[in-house]
Amino acid sequence: PAYTYTASCSVIEHVGATPVMVDIQEDHFEMNYDALAEAITEKTKVVIPVELAGVPCDYRRIFEVVESKRGLFQPSTNLQRYFNRIIVVSDCAHAIGTTRDGVSVAKLADFASYSFHAVKNLTTAEGGCITWNPENELDSEAMYKEFQVYSLHGQTKDALAKIKPGSWEYDIVIPGFKCNMPDIMAAIGLAQLERYPQLLE
């Protein structure tokens, strides 16, 4: 949507794609689903709905639009070929714990990204996480390894694995980013996650 944070657009720019904005509804924070349908072309690979202020999008409508445009879809990666349709990635930076019709928004999209920034109600000061919908039957171990490599400058081993005797060698397989979460921040996040239901109340 046009009313969003820069992160939703930056990730598109990082992969060399062109972001196309879809505005919100006149009287609501949800995206305009008719405008979404009009914006989709044969170049569209991903739709990134934003759960602005914790207001969940209507994923039934989003997937209806995606399904109606299936004939336009032209996959260019293995993941895109696996889905064989536009992938839906929810920006859940404001939506930890948000549900729609009793279902977590993370389970409504194909993937969901979360922010644990200092201003969020579950924080590790910085950082975030990505989840994927188990109903899509992705290879979770392979997905985890792929995200791990991306977050470690493209290295095939993390710092702990490299310090074990005889394990200092590693490969750099892609031009990744340095965005792995330190253990201390992760521990803070896990402790907050345990008490998160109380925080929501």
Segments predicted by a language model, with ranges:
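Hydrophobic/aromatic ligand-binding patch that stacks against planar heteroaromatic rings
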Residues: 10-12, 104, 184
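Active-site region of PLP-dependent enzymes
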Residues: 76-81, 94-101, 108-201
